[in-house]
C-alpha cells in the first residue's frame, strides 16, 4: 500500500476489521446499520474504473465476500452495495446490512437518522464476529 493513505473522514467514521488482498475492510461507527466499507489500498483511486481489470475483478470478489460475511453475521433481510463518493472522493464501496425494522427502511440510509454510536463493547463484539467470518480470507485476521 505504498503511497496510500486513508481519507481522514473514512478514518474518523470507521474502525478497522481486516485487510484483504486489495482492500481494507472497515466498520462504520453507526449502530443503526451494520455497515462495512471496503477501501482499495491503492493511491489516487476515485472510480471503480480507475482500477485495472485484475484489481477491478478482485474488488468485486472482495465485495461479495464482505457481503456474504455481513449477511451471515447479522441475518440481514437485504444488503445495499454502493460506491458513491460524492462527499469522500477516495474510492470506497459501502456494504450495508438492512432490516425491515431499521431506522431508514425502506429508504436509503443516507439522509436518515443521525449517526448513533455503538454501546460499549457492542462494536468490538461485531468486529470480532466479522473478523471470524472473513478471517480465512484475510491477510490480517
Labelled PLM ranges:
Residues 1-141:
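HIT superfamily nucleotide-processing domains
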